[in-house]
Structure formats: structure tokens, C-alpha cells
Amino acid sequence: MIQSLYEPFRHWSETGSIYMLADTHFDDADCKLMDPEWITAEEQLEIITGMVHRNDTFIHLGDVGNGKYIAEIRAKNKILVLGNHDRRSDYAGLFDELYTGPLFISDRILISHEPVCGLTWCLNIHGHDHSRQEAYGDGCKHLNLAANVCGYRPVSLGRLIKNGILSDVDGIHRETIDKAKKIKKIG
């Protein structure tokens, strides 16, 4: 269980791991234009189902493509943060929860489809960018999970946290408190 998740999202980690991935673009015709090494929907599904299991939560950070592949993922919870190519009506029966995003799931983690810039106090986990750009020049910490960028492998949120990805992320509450203290001292 990931205790730092905000209450509405804690059930995602009650019975298993939380895995995230973006931009699968299952069966979309123009994938090879984004990346000449793009693999097929079937190959992606094989990777995903080999990692995400029945008690896990699978969070798709948008641009799903053909929804028929989502039904093959055996996760307990399937969550979608809609991407710029997604329509809610196409996926309403395939995902347990749908969000238009961006979505703060803890005081230090923002999930979204597109990168959100200017928030220096949180980790933004997103997709949308099919390049392997690591820095967006905005002082923010980003993790790009576009499928072709992360090897088509869903990433475990618990493992990221355990490996220290949040170690240099202060969180909104700490920054807000520090700013309030500075204002009080000045005034």
C-alpha cells in the first residue's frame, strides 16, 4: 500500500502494485512516423500482460488507440487519464475510472497526459512526448512514460518511490508552508 496517495486513490494500491504507461496508440496507423522502431499492439500487450497482474492497478496516461486491447489486461483497476487522441465515450466501458487530468494523486505526484510545466514542487508523470527528452527546462521533475520512450514497459509507482524518485521533491505542502512563513516574517 502506498500511504502517501490521497484518500480517493488509495484503493489503487490496496491489493497489488500500481503500473503506469502512456501512448500505446494500439493499432494507430501513424505510429511508425513517431518512431520507426514502434512495435505492434500485440507485442505491446504481451509486455503489459506479462507485468500487470490480476490484483494490480493499471493507469494509462492517455492516447490508448484501439480499446479492444484494454480488455485483455487483467488488472483489478484500470484507470485512464484521457489523452489528446482519446474520447471518453470510446473507453467508458473499458476502464473503471476516467479522468480528464491533470490529477494530483499525492502531495508530490501529478499524473497527466501532457507534460505540465512550472510546478517545481512535484514529480509530473506523463506521456504525450514521443521523443526521449528528459528535461523540459522548467525546473520541474518529469517522468515521461510514452510507450516508445520507456520500452513499452509499464512502470511500477511503488518501485519508483522505493528507488527514491521523490527524494528531491519537496511537495506542495512544504512549499506552501515555507512561503507562508516568509510572508509572515516580512509582514
What are these model-derived regions, one by one?
Residues H11-W12, E72, C117-G118:
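Short, flexible hinge/linker loops that cap or flank conserved catalytic cores
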Residues H60, V81-N84:
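Glycine-rich, low-complexity intrinsically disordered segments
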Residues T15, N55, A75-N77, T120-W121:
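A general structural motif
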